[in-house]
UniProtKB/Swiss-Prot annotation:
Induction: Expressed in the early phase of the viral replicative cycle. GO terms for biological process: regulation of DNA-templated transcription. The keyword Nuclease applies. Pfam families: GerE. Its EC number is 3.1.21.-. The gene is hegA. It comes from the Viruses. Keywords: DNA-binding, Early protein, Endonuclease, Hydrolase, Nuclease. InterPro entries: HNH_nuc, Sig_transdc_resp-reg_C-effctor, Tscrpt_reg_LuxR_C, WH-like_DNA-bd_sf. This is H-N-H endonuclease F-TflIV. Endonuclease that introduces double-strand break into pseudo palindromic 17 bp DNA sequence yielding 1 bp extensions with 3'-overhangs. GO terms for molecular function: DNA binding; endonuclease activity. It comes from Escherichia phage T5.
Length: 227
């Protein structure tokens, strides 16, 4: 085993950051390209192929750390790792290896915007931890508004956002009166019955019971009838 190669991880990462090819690095380490490839895997270093015929100027990761920077998450992740800006480990679970190999890492954008490469918005996560984030694969982007609960005007139970009353409080042909009081309910129920009270007050039997319970917190059966 070439322990001398393992001991030169930072130096190798620096050469890669400078844009040196694998062939050049292999010559500098006095090893073959295949040997270099094997040790890069052990060191957890990923090399992005570059076409230096068209661009000889290497840009470091720090040049892309702003909102709207034109670089893919994959390339920026590799630059961050190769330049040693972050250690090769998941920032959530802390794993560095899996099955005796460097654990695969993905670049997480905390706000869900893959173009926002500000440093505080970035995190290196393993695929499992990344999949559990609320913005993974574009989920919930811009949906962090507080949920508004709509309630029935009569019994105050939760209903859909477009409705004004629940089904029990809106029987066909009956006019809703949201101002029904506890005294009215107790009067009609104690003197007659729930059915008579529902007809007099313009609310279904079930709706009237729910209305009474929501206003008093008591069981509707607690109303005693006057004989």
């Amino acid at each position: 085993m070439r322990t001398d190669i393992l001991d030169r991880k930072e130096e190798i990462a620096q050469w890669i950051a400078q844009g040196k090819s694998k062939a050049e690095i292999a010559r500098m380490l006095s090893c073959s390209s295949n040997t270099l490839e094997a040790y890069l895997g052990k060191l957890g270093i990923v090399v992005i192929p570059t076409n230096r015929q068209y661009d000889n100027k290497y840009k470091s990761a720090t040049e892309y750390l702003y909102n709207g920077s034109p670089i893919s998450s994959y390339k920026l992740k590799n630059k961050i790792l190769n330049e040693g800006l972050k250690p090769h480990k998941c920032e959530s679970c802390g794993l560095e290896s899996w099955l005796d190999k460097p654990i695969p890492l993905e670049l997480e954008h905390k706000d869900g915007n893959h173009y926002n490469n500000e440093w505080d918005n970035l995190a290196l996560l393993c695929p499992n931890c990344h999949a559990l984030t609320p913005t993974h694969a574009g989920k919930n982007i811009g949906r962090y508004t507080e949920r508004t609960v709509n309630t029935c005007a009569i019994c105050h139970c939760e209903i859909s956002s477009r409705a004004t009353h629940c089904k029990s409080c809106t029987p066909k042909g009956i006019t809703i009166n949201p101002d029904i009081t506890v005294e009215q309910i107790e009067y009609w129920v104690s003197k007659y019955s729930w059915i008579r009270a529902s007809k007099e007050l313009g609310l279904s039997d079930t709706g009237l019971r729910k209305r009474y319970k929501s206003l008093t917190g008591k069981d509707p059966k607690s109303i005693k009838k006057n004989r």
